[in-house]
Amino acid sequence: MSSTDQPPPSHLGSGGDLQPLGKPMSIEQHLLDKGAAMLQSLKPVKQISQHACTFALYSHDMTRQIETHHYITRINQDFLQCAVYDSDESNGRLIGVEYIVSDRIFEGLPPEEQKLWHSHAYEIKSALWINPRAPEMVVKPELQNLTKTYGKFWCTWQTDRGDRLPLGPPALMMSPQAVSLGMVKPDLVLKRDAKYGISTEAIRDSRVEFEEPEWINPNADYWKQHGKGFVVDIEPTEMKKIAPFP
């Protein structure tokens, strides 16, 4: 089993229904969840400080492009972690996770690891990456820092394929780039513009003075130089049959 484009079995596909499989929540369950939320700290979730909307392309098939919503926690000056959803609505589905590191951290990674990462410079300068409803003046310093970062994004739920549950292994995602294979479909951008009442073109013009990174490591965006993507394959393996305690 690998992270390919094979459609899901009919009973797990959408068939026009995009809702996840399962019964509607009962009143009792709603009350239990509200009570639990009041009693527990949920500290990791409360560290989320940013919402970014952008687009991602499947590493093995870049014609498959999705709008993504990153809910970002900054761990330190060089490292961020993102819970990625397919929308910013209350019923948004958690479709993956992205880790973001500074260029300083990235340069210390092994070359084989670097191949799994993508650059952010074009994505941000072209205004494909936006922070919905946040004034550009407020987010500008953070965006300028992010142009020099690299991300590794694993998609765990291919909702664009019609999957009603997370199926199969994760798929590696890539960022948009200024070459034909990496360009985002115009209709996706126009749809987002209409939703938020923005002009991506106008935002792009406002970012024209953002500094370009002096150098983007060629191991990132591996497909641009080599025309190869990556898929995850699942294989049976022998277990270590040693008890963790006597």
Residue ranges and their predicted role:
Residues 79-81, 94:
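Short, surface-exposed beta-edge/turn micro-motifs
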Residues 1-79, 143-246:
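N-terminal domain-onset segments
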Residues 88-185:
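An exposed acidic His-Trp-rich patch
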